[in-house]
């Protein structure tokens, strides 16, 4: 194992000089072995500058780091604990426990930089994953072993939606889950831990956090740490759920690291390697013949602009996109999913069946027509519409309200108990509204209910 010395420190970027015959490889993990506060600090090699000098990114605070400190080369990339020992534990980017519950006690470690499964090893599945959330199951159904993105600006409910998905899927799904908190709030990580503990599924979840107060190196690599843990479960033949909150912070950390390394920025100031970095992560999140990884990723949309390079690059890798709209949230309709913007590859009559496809298509057609008529209504009023258009508007308003749903994880704020709606009930409810079966029920009865039966019951109570 070779040793070198720190020759330059610029924030999180540290240059280390080694003898010419033992220069570390790119991505090798180095460790500060000198005296002081930085003893044990891990550095990851990013570039070889020549003359035995390597440029590294610190995986922790570089406060107190100085030139001349001794650095040891581990000879391999960062390794993290994997396997059942990680379940119920909270770890940092290096796989070290941060929950004060003692050592992990793992039997095996994986390196965080791994090749994606080969083309022959990958497998596709068209099996649907029921979420219990009406708007998602109807308009943008999830595939088991697929990749899903939750897109939305600040404060429209990405994390709450993700928590509800974890609550509904992780409880109903007997498999294991891995949660990677990438550059998000520490408070949310804390809430998530207690949420899992209260629901009794903590022993099925491994948590990896690199929160927003951490250096960019941690935030850039923590998604790979979580993914490595998920890959181990998949390779053992299990079906695993991988939740990443938030993939945008992964991109942002890459931007910070890129700037620190002196690379020329590209469009909107992002790193020139944006597409490649995203591809390296996303290509590994895949299902093989032995097991599956179903991934749900929250994607922050800067300034609500879906054409921003970061969300635009993420779109290409996903099977389903759930777009959260500020306009829908402002109407008080939660989850604020935009049924006209959200898409899924699974919404195909050969996959979901003809009835589901027709109902979803019908809902989107009615909502689109209502959107077009809004300007006419605003200027001339409802009286100027034809009878057919009036009927369509009334049904569209009922559909809009019926797309809302009380969440289990939001019970504390709303005071109304959460509802899980089966796919069969969802299709039955929307089909009934489209066919005019519930034209006699006032639109208020459809707001914040589960199944259509609850809406009917609510209307009868009001009479």
From Swiss-Prot:
Enzyme class, broadest EC rank: translocase
InterPro entries in UniProt: AAA+_ATPase (IPR003593), ATP-synt_VA_C (IPR055190), ATP_synth_F1_bsu (IPR005722), ATPase_a/bsu_AS (IPR020003), ATPase_alpha/beta_chains (IPR050053), ATPase_F1/V1/A1_a/bsu_N (IPR004100), ATPase_F1/V1/A1_a/bsu_N_sf (IPR036121), ATPase_F1/V1/A1_a/bsu_nucl-bd (IPR000194)
Species name: Shewanella frigidimarina (strain NCIMB 400)
PROSITE patterns cross-referenced by the UniProt entry: ATPASE_ALPHA_BETA
Key word Ligase present: no
GO cellular component assignments: plasma membrane; proton-transporting ATP synthase complex
Functional description taken from the UniProt entry: Produces ATP from ADP in the presence of a proton gradient across the membrane. The catalytic sites are hosted primarily by the beta subunits.
Subunit structure, interactors included: F-type ATPases have 2 components, CF(1) - the catalytic core - and CF(0) - the membrane proton channel. CF(1) has five subunits: alpha(3), beta(3), gamma(1), delta(1), epsilon(1). CF(0) has three main subunits: a(1), b(2) and c(9-12). The alpha and beta chains form an alternating ring which encloses part of the gamma chain. CF(1) is attached to CF(0) by a central stalk formed by the gamma and epsilon chains, while a peripheral stalk is formed by the delta and b chains.
The protein's name in its UniProt record: ATP synthase subunit beta 1
Keyword Lyase set for record: no
Membrane protein topology class: Peripheral membrane protein
Signal peptide span: none
Gene assigned in the entry: atpD1
């Amino acid at each position: 194992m070779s040793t070198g010395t720190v020759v330059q420190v610029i924030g999180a970027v540290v240059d280390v000089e080694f003898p010419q015959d033992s220069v570390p490889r790119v991505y090798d993990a180095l460790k500060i072995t000198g005296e002081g506060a930085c003893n044990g600090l891990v550095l990851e090699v990013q570039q070889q500058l020549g003359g035995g000098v390597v440029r590294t990114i610190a995986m922790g605070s570089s406060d107190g780091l100085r030139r001349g400190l001794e650095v040891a080369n581990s000879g391999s990339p960062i390794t993290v604990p994997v396997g059942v020992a990680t379940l119920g534990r909270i770890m940092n980017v290096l796989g070290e426990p941060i929950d004060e519950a003692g050592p992990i006690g793992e039997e095996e470690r994986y390196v965080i930089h791994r090749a994606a499964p080969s083309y022959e090893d990958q497998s596709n599945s068209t099996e649907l994953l029921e979420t219990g959330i009406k708007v998602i199951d109807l308009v943008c159904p999830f595939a088991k072993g697929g990749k899903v993105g939750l897109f939305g600006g600040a404060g429209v409910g990405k994390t709450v939606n993700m928590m509800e998905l974890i609550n509904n899927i992780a409880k109903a799904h007997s498999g294991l889950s891995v949660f990677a908190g990438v550059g998000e709030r520490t408070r949310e990580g804390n809430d998530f831990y207690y949420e899992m503990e209260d629901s009794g599924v903590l022993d099925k979840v491994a948590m990896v956090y690199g929160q927003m107060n951490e250096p960019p190196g941690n935030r850039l690599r923590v998604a790979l740490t979580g993914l490595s843990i998920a890959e181990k479960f998949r390779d053992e033949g299990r079906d695993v759920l991988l939740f990443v909150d938030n993939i945008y912070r992964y991109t942002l950390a890459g931007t910070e690291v890129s700037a620190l390394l002196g690379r020329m920025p590209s469009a909107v100031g992002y790193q020139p390697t944006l597409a490649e970095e995203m591809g390296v992560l996303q290509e590994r999140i895949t299902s093989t013949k032995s097991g599956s990884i179903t991934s749900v990723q929250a994607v922050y949309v800067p300034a609500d602009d879906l054409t921003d390079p970061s969300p635009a690059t993420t779109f290409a890798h996903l099977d389903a996109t759930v777009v959260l709209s500020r306009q829908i949230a402002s109407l008080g309709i939660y989850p604020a999913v935009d049924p006209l913007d959200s898409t899924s590859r699974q919404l195909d009559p050969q996959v979901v069946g003809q009835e589901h496809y027709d109902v979803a298509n019908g809902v989107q057609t009615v909502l689109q027509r209502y959107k077009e008529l809004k300007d006419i209504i605003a200027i001339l009023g409802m009286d100027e519409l034809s009878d057919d258009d009036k009927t369509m508007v009334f049904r569209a308003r009922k559909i809009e309200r019926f797309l809302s749903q009380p969440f289990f994880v939001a019970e504390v704020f709303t005071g109304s108990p959460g509802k899980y709606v089966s796919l069969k009930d969802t299709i039955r409810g929307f089909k009934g509204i489209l066919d005019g079966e519930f034209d006699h029920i006032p639109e208020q009865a459809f707001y914040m209910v589960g199944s259509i039966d609850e809406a009917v019951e609510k209307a009868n109570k009001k009479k």
